[in-house]
């Protein structure tokens, strides 16, 4: 039987070979090559971290933060480079969801 860590590392390598993964990498490179897209992306990631911290402490976003979320959504939709990145990332996330379901199935079986 294979070592479980060897299997996990093989999954890591295989995941990186997926066309969808490579498409996300290409989209990220396009963001990095465009100063406007890079600035928007970096600002959004920082804002997203701020919102996650707030939610982890049990707080809800204020109306001002909700308005800022809406504004980011509009800016992202207006920027084709950033929009493409998030579209490609979502396509890749289908694999992650499937893998997560498969990996955690034995743990769920223990709870039955």
UniProtKB/Swiss-Prot annotation:
Domain of life: Bacteria
Coiled-coil segments on the chain, per record: none
Disulphide bonds in the chain: none
InterPro entries: Com_YlbF, YheA/YmcA-like_dom_sf
NCBIfam families: PRK13676.1-1
Family: Belongs to the UPF0342 family.
Name this protein carries in UniProt: UPF0342 protein SGO_1370
């Amino acid at each position: 039987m294979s070592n479980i860590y060897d299997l996990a590392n093989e999954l890591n390598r295989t995941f990186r070979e997926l066309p969808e993964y490579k498409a996300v990498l290409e989209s990220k490179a396009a963001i990095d090559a465009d100063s406007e897209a890079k600035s928007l992306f970096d600002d959004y990631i920082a804002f997203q971290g701020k919102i996650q911290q707030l939610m982890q402490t049990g707080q809800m976003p204020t109306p001002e933060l909700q308005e800022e979320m809406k504004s980011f959504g509009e800016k992202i939709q207006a920027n084709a480079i950033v929009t493409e990145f998030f579209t490609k990332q979502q396509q890749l996330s289908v694999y992650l969801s499937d893998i997560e379901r498969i990996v955690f199935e034995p743990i769920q079986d223990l709870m039955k």
